[in-house]
């Protein structure tokens, strides 16, 4: 199983969880980690390069901290530019058909806030629905996300454990 992780954090150097995840995932031969803000500091995305990379992998993982109930802006821009009509969707757009899409998400708040009646009023599953809809449109299989809740309450041990669990999770077969 070849896995491409697109790590999207605008301040990766000062990140706690996402940085630890990148460091752990980079140790695995079948996982390629690309930090999009580092790759494109000017946000000028090389669409052809990104499409070619996506075609080489079985599973694509979007890794990001939840920002305002969504992803950081560069991931949205990446989707807008890379997942084009005729390549990712439409009658001729089948480049990603049969591949898998997974999310690896960190949140500042604890899990209890992400449910009906919780502080955020919606479950993480509801908040991530646009990614599932995108996956459906482009013919990918949407896999259950890996979520690390409560970053602001986590200690170093929690973070190290989460990184190892993520590495195991994104490599496991789901079908």
Locate the predicted segments by residue:
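Hydrophobic/aromatic beta-strand patches that form the interior of the parallel beta-sheet core
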Residues: 4-6, 32-34, 61, 102-104, ...
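Flexible, glycine-rich phosphate/dinucleotide-binding loops
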Residues: 12-13, 40-42, 110, 154
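Generic recognition of short, well-ordered alpha-helical segments
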Residues: 16-20, 45, 73-77, 157
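Glycine-rich phosphate/pyrophosphate-binding loop and the adjoining helix
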Residues: 22-26, 128-175
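Helix-loop-strand module that forms the ligand-binding subsite of alpha/beta enzymes
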Residues: 48-132
């Amino acid at each position: 199983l070849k896995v491409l992780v697109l790590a999207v954090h605008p301040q990766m150097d000062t990140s706690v969880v996402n940085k630890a995840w990148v460091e752990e995932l980079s140790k695995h031969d079948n996982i390629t980690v690309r930090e999009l803000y580092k790759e494109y500091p000017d946000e000028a995305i090389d669409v052809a390069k990104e499409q070619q990379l996506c075609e080489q992998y079985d599973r694509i993982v979007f890794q990001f901290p939840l920002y305002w109930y969504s992803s950081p802006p560069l991931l949205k821009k990446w989707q807008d530019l890379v997942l084009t009509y005729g390549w990712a969707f439409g009658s001729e757009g089948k480049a990603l058909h049969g591949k898998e899409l997974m999310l690896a998400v960190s949140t500042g708040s604890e899990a209890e806030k992400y449910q009906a009646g919780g502080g955020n009023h919606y479950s993480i599953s509801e908040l991530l629905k646009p990614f599932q809809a995108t996956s459906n449109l482009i013919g990918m299989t949407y896999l259950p996300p890996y979520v690390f809740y409560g970053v602001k309450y986590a200690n170093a041990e929690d973070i190290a454990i989460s990184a190892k669990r993520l590495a195991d999770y994104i490599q496991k077969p789901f079908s």
